[in-house]
Swiss-Prot record:
It comes from Fibrobacter succinogenes (strain ATCC 19169 / S85). Sequence repeats lie at residues 271-277, 278-284, 285-291, 292-298, 301-307. Residues 258-311 are annotated as: Disordered. PROSITE patterns: GH16_1, GH16_2. Residues 271-307 are annotated as: 5 X 7 AA tandem repeats of P-X-S-S-S-S-X. Its EC number is 3.2.1.73. It catalyses: Hydrolysis of (1->4)-beta-D-glucosidic linkages in beta-D-glucans containing (1->3)- and (1->4)-bonds. The active site is at E79, E83. The lineage of its organism: Bacteria, Pseudomonadati, Fibrobacterota, Fibrobacteria, Fibrobacterales. Disulfide bonds: none annotated. GO terms for biological process: carbohydrate metabolic process. Belongs to the glycosyl hydrolase 16 family. This is Beta-glucanase.
């Protein structure tokens, strides 16, 4: 999508522009899922025990992401990825994304996984410090990056997982919908604080919390309900399930969001869930609008059926705001002006 920014000088022009931009972005034929922590942190270690989904045309992932990176207003893009590309589940792609929206810098590398990521559970790890980013699989280092892009990973990031289908066949392969439904299984997640030299055995990390998904903890996790450019699916909370001690992300046809299968067995026992001390006063919730918390222009549905929508500066209903959610951000600026395949737009519903 590459829509030129237009200055609107009157209420009539605003209404006309809103009508012209109307697009049903929830009319996609497929539904995916995204899970994210409500808290963002600066530095840490993140581990997840997972059996990934894989079919040509899909992406099954674990990543760190600074909410709002996708907004083209000059702020930095901050992201660190583990992505299993469906065309080759025998490996995963590691990546750091920095720069700015429309001018991102990436550093993709590919790493073998055996057994294949969709055939067995593996423990995937990310370590993020001021000096390096390190990727591990089953406790073994597969990549470590120091300096360069790492110095640009400023601010905070939240932990996320998603399952979706890219429209870029060159990247992920031709989409094969006959393979649906697909499922990504997460047995447990551990998050560690960055505590240089003070962790177990003198390490730089101290365990903060563990989630074994015996139940879904809504005080810790949010369920995505959005889409983004280049995504064949709508990400929906209907495709996230907690069953038999496993968190499940699904990729399905629209209207068939469900999980009626058997949860696969992981031979490694899950740890007990634990909670960290409350940190909400200083954390940056990833479930907020794509603009910083200090902005007053984010759209928040009130108790009544209509509101002044900061997206278009007009009285409208939440449903209308939802229609326009991936065309403009909460500041009223056009998103993704350079048609980049990866950006996210949060919206209320």
């Amino acid at each position: 999508m590459n829509i030129k920014k237009t200055a609107v000088k009157s209420a009539l022009a605003v209404a006309a522009a809103a009508a012209a931009l109307t697009t049903n972005v929830s009319a996609k034929d497929f539904s995916g899922a995204e899970l994210y922590t409500l808290e963002e942190v600066q530095y840490g270690k993140f581990e997840a025990r997972m059996k990934m989904a894989a079919a040509s045309g899909t992406v099954s992932s674990m990543f760190l992401y600074q909410n709002g990176s996708e907004i083209a207003d000059g702020r930095p893009w901050v992201e660190v990825d583990i992505e299993v590309l469906g065309k080759n589940p025998g490996s995963f792609q590691s990546n750091i994304i920095t720069g700015k929206a429309g001018a991102q810098k990436t550093s993709e590398k590919h790493h073998a996984v055996s057994p294949a990521a969709d055939q067995a559970f593996h423990t995937y790890g990310l370590e993020w410090t001021p000096n390096y980013v390190r990727w591990t699989v089953d406790g073994q280092e597969v990549r470590k990056t120091e300096g360069g892009q790492v110095s640009n990973l400023t601010g905070t990031q939240g932990l996320r997982f998603n399952l979706w289908s890219s429209e870029s066949a060159a990247w992920v392969g031709q989409f094969d919908e006959s393979k649906l439904p697909l499922f990504q299984f997460i047995n447990w997640v551990k998050v560690y604080k960055y505590t240089p030299g003070q962790g177990e055995g003198g390490s730089d990390f101290t365990l903060d919390w563990t989630d074994n998904f015996d139940t879904f903890d809504g005080s810790r996790w949010g369920k995505g309900d959005w889409t983004f450019d280049g995504n064949r699916v709508d990400l929906t909370d209907k495709n996230i399930y907690s069953r038999d001690g496993m968190l499940i992300l699904a990729l399905t046809r629209k209207g068939q969001e469900s999980f009626n299968g058997q949860v696969p067995r992981d031979d490694e026992p899950a740890p007990q869930s634990s909670s960290s001390a409350p940190a909400s006063s200083s954390s940056v919730p990833a479930s907020s609008s794509s603009v910083p918390a200090s902005s007053s222009s984010a759209f928040v549905p009130p108790s009544s059926s209509s509101a002044t929508n900061a997206i278009h500066g007009m009285r409208t209903t939440p449903a209308v705001a939802k229609e326009h959610r991936n065309l403009v951000n909460a500041k009223g600026a056009k998103v993704n002006p350079n048609g980049h395949k990866r950006y996210r737009v949060n919206f209320e519903h």
